[in-house]
Amino acid sequence: VPGELFNEQEHYLGRPADITDKIVIRRISLLEQYPAFTGTQYTHLDIGCGNGAAMFLLSQKMKSCVGIDIVNDYEQDINDYLKKNNISNCRFQCVDIEKDISSLQQQFDRITSFEVIEHLHDENSVSIYRKLLKDDGLMAISVPNKWWIFETHGAKLPLLPWNRVPFFSWLPRFLHERWANARIYTKGRITRLLERNGFEVLHSSYITAPMDVLKEGRLKRLLVKYLFKNDTTKNPFKSTAILVIARRRK
């Protein structure tokens, strides 16, 4: 795992997916299929927006979008993309939600946060998402799926230079989190986490592995066409991530 993906405290930040990656397209497609998640009357907050990919794709389907991230590495790229594509209802803000959210100064109708919760210092900081969501708002998050054969975020394993060892993610939690760069979840674990922090889970599904890590070619085309075709799967072993849609519990 490249060193630039860690901050000064050696905390793993991850690498954002590109706007053309299949995983991004699948996430947005699933949100569009969920009744009334998108709408030009809704304000939208993307927590951990990275390079802004999800925000860009949702911009025409929302009233306004704010993308926030713990670092501003992609701020110039985001602003350049917005200007180039004449998008006027989006903006970026550098915010560490685990420290201070006062600069946001509002609550939002819709929140998205893709592959972010596993990077929080304390997973219970998801309670802050609730503070940022309106009473009748909806939230969509995704987290890495424990039952995918490969460790999606890599690990610092002793004596092993390759950090994506098959089945490492299947180890018991106390062993996995000793070496892994990020937490990993089952449907049960992420549901319990959200419920513990004031959310009601409305929907969860396994996002089919997008095969973005493979080089373009015949093998990738065949895998996507025949084994990893649909946006979701009922087979957890074919899924890299879990998508959850939730609302504030009243």
Region annotations inferred by a language model:
Residues 1-106, 110-114, 126, 205-209, ...:
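Conserved N-terminal segment of class I S-adenosyl-L-methionine
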Residues 4, 8-23, 53, 70, ...:
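S-adenosyl-L-methionine-dependent methyltransferase catalytic module, highlighting the catalytic core
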Residues 42, 136-137:
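Surface-exposed loop/turn positions
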Residues 45, 132-133:
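Generic leucine side-chain signal with a strong bias for well-ordered alpha-helical environments
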Residues 47, 120-121:
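Short, glycine/acidic-rich beta->alpha junctions
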Residues 115-119:
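A short His-aromatic
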